[in-house]
Amino acid sequence: MLSFVVGKRNIIAMETRQIIGRERECDLLTRICNEREARLIALYGRRRVGKTYLVKNYFEEKFDFFFTGSFETPVQAQLSLFRDALCQYTGKQYDTPKDWNQAFAMLRDYLSQIKKERIVVFFDELPWMDTPKSNFLSAFSYFWNSWASTLDGLKLIICGSATSWMIDKIIGDKGGLYGRVSHTIYIAPFNLHEVELFLQKRKGILWNRYQILQAYMIFGGIPYYLDMLDKNVTFAENIDQLFFKHNAPLRTEYEFLFRSLFKSSNVYRQVVEAVAKKNKGLTLSEIKTALKVGASGKLTEVLKNLCSCDFLRKYSEYGKKEKSAVYQLTDLYSLFYQKFVVGNNGRDEHFWSNISDNTRNAWAGYAFEQACLHHISQIRSKLGIQGVLTNVCTWAMDRKTDSDGTQWPGVQIDLLLCRGDHIINVCEMKYSQSEFVVSREYEQHLRERNNTFAHFTKTKDALHTVLVTTYGLKQNAYSGSIYTTVTADDLFER
């Protein structure tokens, strides 16, 4: 029998089951399982992020009932699979239910016979059960509201990769499930600290942090992709095998990823591909122009869903209104795929091993920036401002000439930490294979950029330049222009 007591025994059990990271999520599950009342728990997050793995391993697969939806499967076939699962758990034979209402009635009859203090039911890939004209959601709502919510000790866990569906239909539902979800648990991709633990403990891969950072910049913190790495070949050979060999698994993953997450997946792909073409991202107006579409609530919904599924991030520019917000591609796997895999059919199967240093470094510069933006918490920790109210934004300006002839350079600042103590950390994110060297020209660039920002924004806050770079800063006559340095090692902190 599972023990849910928080303490040393539970930690040891978690290590045995090889749950990497997820301490907060496991602690929350423990607390929920120690509650007497019935609970409806919704887990959501990007596909391949490890939602199913977490639930199965936390509970050691000891469920009183488990069922997973089947992708693009008609309702009658889903109901037949549900019948098979019920037969497996009860040891009895059942006819296939005629609809979901009957299926849940059969489940209710089975669960009501279980005499246990705690009953655990797990529905995985719930969105896939909600096929057209199946009335699944209304049947599920009735099952929970009319009976399951009254069964003390029941822990009903629902999970889905289609994050937008989970948020709209379950977590934010305005109908039968309004306010019924007891707990929502968002499963985020691993951070660098967790990627390092995963590679060492799960895969036995003892790469240095520079190599781990490169892996993160390609795969993001997605455990499913990281689990494909082979410790017996080099880093470059791993990338070739996974992306560029004939039938490489991550070459075909991209299309399935979108089809499994979104209806009308072509529209979602078109948006991602449009945004991917511009490193700084696109505004809503620019996306409409790129896709040649007019004003549409559908496009706004697509963008919202892509943000909720961790493909895009929406960020505001300093001092500008919401309508000027920019959408930027932040899913690192999609970024790498768009840059190197699209249109690569028939190319060298050892493409990554043979690619030029200039091409690789150009990509790495931008990918490193995105990796940094996924670790703002670690950057704030290094700066010692975790307890300071901080807004995260960006700022950009095209080259301008004033009426008096004064020329101002074009400026692009990818990360501003605007603090409540009237300090703005102006962050420079620079990928380097050694200590970063501030030249005279670069020092002048930083000075002109800060002056331009202060002049046009009219800010009275102090501007502190922060350098985020792989190996730190080489001291020289110009390094004093950097207020604080954050290294890759700092990004690996918890």
Task: Report each predicted region and the residues it spans.
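A cross-kingdom feature that marks ATP-driven nucleic-acid transaction machinery
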Residues: 318, 325-494
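Phosphate-binding site recognition
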Residues: 1-354, 358, 465
